[in-house]
Design a protein with these regions (language model features):
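Redox-cofactor binding/interface segments in oxidoreductases and associated redox assembly factors
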Residues: 49, 214, 321
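The conserved beta1-alpha1 loop
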Residues: 215-217, 367
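Active-site-proximal cap/loop segments of hydrolase catalytic domains
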Residues: 247-454
Length: 456
């Protein structure tokens, strides 16, 4: 699910040239997806990334780089790696972002006009480029943080520390749940991170709490240590209702370099799920999460993971599945980014629908009727296969819910759906004191390192 994301997931649609756009038609036979794919040099030249005809291909697989002179002369600089975007000038040279070859699931990198990877081996992930009068500024996702670097000859120079934009200004008078950083190890020893957000006014000493695990989209996305509020069930929204939230960053996401991102290629939902489950086990073991009041929620790839999780275990009492894939072969055939989906999982063995008879968890399935990224048939298939599920389809909505009334309705349904977890509390529930055994039979013993966040 190749959506372009903010703190959760933003609407992704196949790029189309805007009608009358000033840069449309710069390169005959090709199209420019957006203004962000054109960079202007002070002397009037333009660096342009083009894609093939949007009517036959979204273009992510075969972009090309060009220089267009002021008189309209086009110089072709050759094909660029998949998903090329955001060209900027660096003196008389051009650099841009693209996927690290040769796979379609992996980390973004910075390339020069000769298509050489300038960030190979970097243990973080470039997410944006900004043209300046000198060296370009590279926005870098590094773990839970975001940093700004200057692109230099053979090295990056960091120009800021962690950058956290203030997204909560309109809510300064609203009490928020305490947010903490969580670091732990996967069963195979891989270092992982994530966030824990507690109910408003509570500390970990007040636990165990009902816990909702929020799985991010992508999978090439992440939870950053910033304000967690969105139009889907989100951590601060849940904190207002007495829930703790676990926001894991499993392998496959951004912020940890190319190898970390590429680890789920052809193995979607495998080690990725164990990364998530291990974090839940540790939160139960530390008395933060009530093992009898666990829920899971996600949108897009997170929706797939929520559906996949309840085929792996019966520990969840509620699962919110938003715009998620349930059948990978059908998604590859009917979705608009089939080649990218095939790089993640291409068989029924990766599909929740194959194991739907195992699902005992109640499901709330939500989808946009006009979603072309993940067609609504994915939701309909899962709903038809699971009797204890509710399906909500919003007419006219795409891969993101954009209409205010629909957002309110979605959150109201989610609120009532997850409220059932409060009713499951045992009168004498006590925190677990030993590591919990997950559905796979593993016992996880690595220590948890809790770090206080500056978010609130």
């Amino acid at each position: 699910m190749r959506e372009l994301t903010d703190e959760m997931v933003a609407d992704w649609t196949t790029p189309r040239p805007a009608s009358g756009a000033p840069d449309h038609g710069l390169v005959p036979g090709r199209h420019v997806a957006s203004a962000a794919d054109v960079a202007r040099h002070p002397d009037g030249r333009r660096a342009v990334i083009t894609w093939s005809s949007p009517e036959i291909d979204p273009g992510l697989l075969n972009p090309a780089l060009h220089v267009v002179a002021p008189d309209g002369t086009v110089t072709d600089l050759g094909p660029a790696p998949a998903d090329a975007r955001t060209p900027v000038w660096w003196g008389d040279r051009i650099v841009y972002l693209a996927l690290t070859p040769p796979h379609l699931q992996g980390g973004m990198a910075v390339f020069d006009q000769d298509h050489r990877n300038l960030t190979e081996g970097m243990p973080a992930c470039p997410t944006d480029l900004v043209q300046t009068g000198g060296a370009p500024v590279v926005v870098v996702a590094t773990g839970l943080d975001t940093e700004f670097h200057l692109l230099g000859e053979g090295a990056f120079a960091r120009v800021t520390g962690s950058h956290r934009p203030d997204r909560r200004a309109p809510l300064t008078d609203v009490p928020l749940g305490h947010q903490e950083r969580l670091r732990y190890r996967a069963p195979d020893g891989l270092d992982l991170d994530g966030l824990l957000v507690l109910p408003v006014g509570r500390t970990r000493a007040d636990g165990p709490f009902p816990l909702i695990t929020l799985v991010h989209g992508g999978p090439y996305d992440r939870w950053a240590d910033d304000f967690q509020l969105s139009w889907v069930p989100s951590a601060q929204w849940l904190a207002q209702q007495g829930f703790a939230s676990f926001l894991p960053n499993p392998r496959g996401g951004l912020g940890r370099g190319h190898a970390f991102a590429a680890a789920v290629a052809g193995r979607v939902g495998q080690e990725e799920w164990h990364d998530i489950e291990t974090g839940i086990d540790l939160l139960v073991a530390h008395g933060v999460a009530d093992p009898d009041r666990l829920g899971i929620s996600g949108w897009s790839h997170g929706g797939f993971m929520a559906a996949w999780a309840v085929t792996r275990t019966d520990r969840f009492r509620a699962a919110f599945v938003g715009a998620g894939i349930s059948d990978w072969p059908k998604q590859i055939a009917h979705g608009e980014c089939g080649a990218f989906e095939a790089a993640l999982g291409d068989s029924a063995e990766h599909s929740p629908i194959t194991f739907a008879d195992r699902i005992t968890t109640p499901l709330l399935i939500v989808h946009g009727a006009a979603d072309t990224n993940v067609p609504v048939e994915q939701a309909e298939l899962l709903h038809a296969a699971v009797a204890h599920s509710e399906l909500v389809v919003y007419p006219g909505e795409g891969h993101a819910i954009t209409q205010r009334a629909n957002k309110i309705d979605l959150l109201d349904r989610a609120r009532r759906f997850f409220a059932t977890l409060h009713d499951l509390r045992k009168p004498c529930a006590t925190p677990a004191t030993t590591p919990q055994t997950g559905a796979s039979g593993r016992i996880d013993t690595p220590p948890v390192s809790w770090q206080r966040s500056d978010t609130n």
